[in-house]
UniProtKB/Swiss-Prot annotation:
Contains 4 disulfide bonds. Expressed by the venom gland. Belongs to the neurotoxin 19 (CSTX) family. 08 (U8-Lctx) subfamily. Residues 21-26 form a propeptide. One of its GO terms (cellular component) is extracellular region. Residues 1-20 form the signal peptide. It comes from Lycosa singoriensis (Wolf spider). The keyword Cell division does not apply. This is U8-lycotoxin-Ls1m. One of its GO terms (molecular function) is toxin activity. The lineage of its organism: Eukaryota, Metazoa, Ecdysozoa, Arthropoda, Chelicerata. It comes from the Eukaryota. The keyword Nuclease does not apply. Keywords: Disulfide bond, Secreted, Signal, Toxin.
Length: 77
């Protein structure tokens, strides 16, 4: 009986460790990819920049993209 409990706990620990490793190895988001729902997933040389969308002074949405750190983007007319 003790052997069955020990084996079950051991298997549970191994499965938990494998899941934690898989989560840490998620690929990062490359430049210009949407990061609205995953702001911490941009690659290390990028930052998740968010911009609000407005219509008639009211915010209608928000977009976030993985962009280069320290770069300022300006709107073209």
């Amino acid at each position: 009986m003790k052997l069955m409990i020990f084996t079950g706990l051991f298997l549970f620990a191994i499965v938990s460790l494998i899941e934690a490793q898989a989560e840490n190895e998620k690929p990062c988001l490359p430049e210009y990819k949407v990061c609205t729902h995953a702001p911490g997933n941009c690659c290390s040389d990028l930052v998740c920049d968010c911009y609000g969308r407005y219509k008639s002074g009211a915010q209608i949405g928000r977009n976030c993209f993985c962009l280069q750190k320290g770069v300022i983007y300006k709107r073209e007319n």
